[in-house]
């Protein structure tokens, strides 16, 4: 029996737009740091590479990595300024269909967010989008390993058993494979591929020499969650 619904945040509940990275330009200018287009692109790429090299989010580690990757010496204040700017990057209103899903799930289950980012910034974005009230807790990647590692999901289940929790997310490797391997249930939100919508699929989980098939759902619209839960 499902007791807790765990939502991924970016591109599941609200969009993360490519243009948000333009805040790097603004932050550099406000800090009076000279830069070229190549510098901007390297910093942008460094954020992605950081996630491939580190499993938690730490400001000191992040700026050290960016400086090593870009061969520059940016101040830690750059990260702090970017976090402040990105915390405002959220729509002020979400689609009514998303609100209905949140109201529905909150009326039946414990509802939380599991994000691969800093908690403070994500809470502010949820507040701006006016949906923070739907969540019992926001779990982030500052004090434990991020998705797809088991530790991320174990913190998000709270006092529940893994099988009593279901993860909803758009990243198959991080959200779906990660949660299934940790023993949770999953709904794969795949808005770009309607052919897979409403299908029940099976993930082959290999444990030593045994292979176990685990059921998960695929949807193309968030409102389909109400037909599953």
Q: Residue spans of the language-model regions?
A:
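Short, acidic loop-to-helix structural element flanking the phosphoryl-transfer center
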Residues: 60, 84-112, 150
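A metal-dependent, Asp-based hydrolase signature
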Residues: 48-84, 96
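Hydrophobic alpha-helical core bundles mediating ligand binding, dimerization, or RNAP-core interactions
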Residues: 20-28, 44-47, 82-86, 122, ...
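Active-site neighborhood of HAD-like aspartate-dependent phosphohydrolases
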Residues: 1-42
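Short, surface-exposed acidic
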Residues: 31-45, 70-82, 133-134
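An amphipathic alpha-helix signature
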Residues: 21-25, 59-63, 119
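Asp-based, Mg2+/Mn2+-dependent phosphohydrolase catalytic module
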Residues: 1-3, 103, 112, 117-229
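Generic recognition of short, well-ordered alpha-helical segments
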Residues: 18-22, 96, 100, 124, ...
